[in-house]
Amino acid sequence: MSARLIIAVVAAITLAGAGPRSREAEIGSLITRPAAVEIADHGYTPEQRGRVAMAQYARCKFGRTPRRVSEYLQLPTAESLAIVHRLATDDCLVSGEIIFQSSQMRGYLFGEMYRLHQGTPPQNWKYPITPLDLVNSPADDAQRDLRVNFMLLTMTDCLHKADPALVRDVVLNAPASIKQKAAYRSLIPKLSACVPKGMNFELSRSVIESAFGEYLYRSLVPAIAVGAGKSR
């Protein structure tokens, strides 16, 4: 099966066995560039494999084309959601296919940048950060992805104010790892108090990780806080 990356509605992954191309990519990555996605089963569920694959894809994509990814993430949310397919290339996929929402791809890229930022001296970080705006909500007739993204960031802001370490633990620990599972066990009971009114879509772990990654990276500069004199 040739490598394919598909932007679609459902997050999932199917990877074929490794062949000559994967061995070549593995050897080359030790010298020149981050490895492409190649996941063994390791006892993961299909849902866990999907999250692991998305995190690995984001790591590879930013590692190989950091300037391009950074420029993409600086665009207004509506514009970046609309052109995500420009980053969806198979250079970071050994074999098989990855299927995920455009907003999830965007969020995992933000999460990867946040992880790297945490390990980099501030004076050496050269990628701009576009601050959050949690006051100016999208219009009622705005595209659904934009409205959903705003609701997720608002939810994350609520959770972060209640327990910032917990939000960071979800993003900084590897998907499906023991530490991340522990973070989720603590997080789940807190979710209901922070879910915005009218939010009627599935809140999967991949959606949560995407929102948390974007929130944390864009909060590295002062965010415009919720409730600054604007009625909803």
Residue ranges and their predicted role:
Residues 26-28, 32, 50, 54, ...:
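Eukaryotic terminal intrinsically disordered regions
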Residues 7-19:
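Hydrophobic h-region of N-terminal signal peptides that target proteins for export
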Residues 49-55, 62, 146-155, 160, ...:
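Short, low-complexity cationic-aromatic patches
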Residues 1-7:
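Bacterial N-terminal signal peptides that target proteins for export
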Residues 19-117:
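N-terminal Sec/ER secretory leader and immediately downstream segment
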Residues 63-88, 162-196:
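Extended intrinsically disordered, low-complexity coil regions enriched in Ser, Thr, Gly, Ala
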Residues 107-175:
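Extended amphipathic alpha-helical interaction segments
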Residues 181-232:
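A cross-kingdom marker for long, charged
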